[in-house]
From Swiss-Prot:
Localization terms from the record: Cytoplasm
Pfam families: Amino_oxidase
Alphabetically ordered keywords of this record: Cytoplasm, FAD, Flavoprotein, Heme biosynthesis, Oxidoreductase
Catalytic activity as recorded in UniProt: coproporphyrinogen III + 3 O2 = coproporphyrin III + 3 H2O2
Transmembrane segments: none
Protein's name according to its UniProt entry: Coproporphyrinogen III oxidase
Cofactor: FAD
Phylogenetic placement of the source organism: Bacteria, Bacillati, Actinomycetota, Actinomycetes, Mycobacteriales
Protein family membership: Belongs to the protoporphyrinogen/coproporphyrinogen oxidase family. Coproporphyrinogen III oxidase subfamily.
Main location group: cytoplasm
Disulfide-linked positions: none
Catalytic activity, EC: 1.3.3.15
Length: 451
């Protein structure tokens, strides 16, 4: 009996998790071939040496209240590499001033009026305080853009100075590009269950008070996880782009950009939505119609190693409100957030949001100049970097717009048997969500192949 073979297209965390889950589920005799044209695996998980220290230049943290990453680390024997944030809190830069991030918010939506005093004007504070007595029209199951709901209930300043900074940091988007069910699912659920105001919904939707840190990371960076997934999955990496996909009577045939053909009993597509559209154009029209409506943003990260004695506040970083003169959308004071470990401090600045071309058009020199200028404007410090690394993420940040879950359901419903999809455009943009979606995809694939 011929052993089965599988092809995974895409070498990010979704593709690598899928390959590993396949290996665990199928054993040693199955061939797993992974296609990724890059010079490295990991996708938007990229660890580089900056100032002699490992530093993640893509995703850098995961929510500890979600179980997927700690569980996977434990399964791989990497639990001792998990580390957590310090107790440093982030700031918001608004009206050319630094403000504390208000406590008890959901995606930046406040749970009290008094907590945002000083960050928004008095009229907005009063509007938020009186919101509970205003009639709320809500249709259960609806999914408005976060900007639409928050502006209507709390005012435009609440959007620009509270919600936009948080969503810009997560999605490289804004409250206008993210739907409520993706950006604040607990708030949407509370409204569905009868909350009579946005304030009440936020209070009901607050996460349980955590006894410890909110975020985790890996000592040595995400490369530690990438390397172990590659080792455990025992995959064959083909550094090529899949350009053709066809289903025959005995499985799938894939064609890469060298002209080579590959056969598979099952296929996992762990690629961004635009590539999904190109690969499935002739195979899955329903999936293509839905995936083509998922748009993405680009961003660039400037990582700096700066002298150890550079004066930064005891905060984890800064989120930038909409309409400010800064070029950066966020600043991460990495050595404050994770603890000072080397002879220098590490800092990250992120540039680019949905709708702009900063990440693809600005030169490295321009990005560095903007980084130094923004640090001076925000912290009143003159920075002379010891080391610099620039990383661009083009079309890497899917925008979870209104109705995104319906699009994802359509993507899955339109797939032919033994072909599954995973990736950051499916069930969440973070690493835990990608791990979960990859596991779900492999479970579905195994059930279909076994029929």
């Amino acid at each position: 009996m011929t052993s089965r073979s599988y092809c995974v297209v895409g070498g990010g965390i979704s593709g690598l998790t899928a390959a590993y889950r396949l290996r665990v589920a199928t054993g040693d005799d199955v061939a797993i071939t992974l296609f990724d044209p890059g010079d490295r695996l990991g996708g938007v998980l990229r660890t580089e040496c900056v100032g002699g220290q490992p530093m993640d230049l893509g995703a850098e943290a995961f929510l500890l209240r979600r179980p997927e990453v700690p569980a996977l680390l434990a399964e791989l024997g990497l639990s001792e590499r998990q580390r957590a944030t310090t107790d440093a809190r982030p700031l918001i830069y608004s009206q050319q001033r630094l403000h504390s991030l208000p406590p008890d918010t959901v995606a930046g939506i406040p749970s009290s009026a008094t907590s945002v005093a000083g960050l928004v004007d008095d009229a907005t504070v009063a509007r938020i305080g009186a919101e509970a007595v205003r009639p709320l029209s809500w249709e259960p199951g609806s999914d408005p853009a976060m900007a639409e709901l928050v502006a209507d209930r709390f005012g435009e300043q609440a959007v620009a100075r509270l919600v936009d900074p948080l969503l810009g940091g997560v999605y490289a988007g804004s409250a206008a590009t993210i739907g409520l069910r993706a950006g604040a699912p607990s708030v949407a659920a509370a409204l569905d269950c009868g909350a009579t105001s946005l304030m009440e919904a936020v209070r009901q939707g607050l996460p349980p008070v955590a006894a410890g840190p909110v975020f985790g990371a890996l000592d040595g960076g995400y490369q530690v996880l990438i390397d172990e997934l590659v080792r455990r999955s025992r995959l064959q990496w083909v550094a090529a782009t899949v350009v053709g996909l066809d289903r025959g009577t005995c499985g799938w045939t894939l064609v890469d950009d060298t002209g080579a053909c590959w056969s598979a009993d099952g296929v996992i597509l762990a690629v961004p939505a635009p590539r999904l559209v190109r690969l499935l154009q002739q195979i899955a029209p329903r999936t293509v119609a839905a995936a083509s409506r998922i748009v993405s943003a680009s961003s660039a990260v400037v990582a700096l190693s700066v002298p150890r004695d550079t004066t930064f506040p005891q905060n984890s970083g800064v989120l930038v409100a909409s309409g400010e003169r800064l070029r950066a959308k966020a600043v991460t004071l990495s050595s404050r957030k994770w603890g000072l470990q080397g002879d220098t401090q590490l800092v990250r600045l992120s540039f680019g949001k949905f709708g702009d071309q900063v990440a693809s058009t600005a030169s490295d020199d321009e990005l560095l100049a903007w980084a130094v200028s923004d640090l001076a404007a925000v912290f009143d410090v003159t920075v002379d970097p010891v080391d610099v690394c620039v990383q661009r993420w083009i079309d890497a940040m899917p925008q979870y717009g209104p109705g995104h879950a319906d699009l994802v359901a359509e993507v899955r419903a339109g797939l032919p048997p033994t072909l599954v999809v995973a990736g950051s455009h499916m069930d969440g943009i973070g690493v835990p969500a990608c791990i979960s979606a990859a596991g779900r995809a492999i479970e579905a694939l195994q059930a279909e192949v076994a029929r």
